[in-house]
Amino acid sequence: MAWPDTLPRRGLYLITPDRADSAALFAACEQVLAARPALLQYRNKSTDPALRLAQAHTLRALTRAAGVGLIINDDVALAEQVGADGVHLGRDDGDIAAARARLGEHAILGASCYDQLPLAHAAVAAGANYIAFGAVCPSTTKPNAVRAPLSLFADSAALGVPRVAIGGIT
């Protein structure tokens, strides 16, 4: 469950928008990867599995070339298929312990904890490498998302894992 030595534990964590236009997605990602973020999360809620697989494979190649970690949102099988560095799971997207068992101890596992410190404790106990709280700002992609108070970041420091602010940060 250790964090990979090849990836930074701090830095910018970018999340892709849902985009069916692969060329536009890849062009945007190439630009941001030049800035060397810590991680890039591929998030595409499309129901087209072929599109998601093709995009994820290309993003894996782009992130490898840039030395940036690739996290797949909500899809352990896709993360496994493309050799991603890990997966990010929301409350209804799968079990952290099951993902750890499937992806192994070197995978990066993240968990959405919304505005709930008990979820963060449970996620870390189940094997999460990082926790995410949010939305910290109003979000256009999830306009009804609950707002997470910034105090959660201090309150969760003792968990000893990186904490990520998500939601409405553009």
Feature annotation, model-predicted:
Residues M1-I96, A101-N129, A145-A148, D155, ...:
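Conserved N-terminal beta1-alpha1 strand-loop-helix module at the mouth
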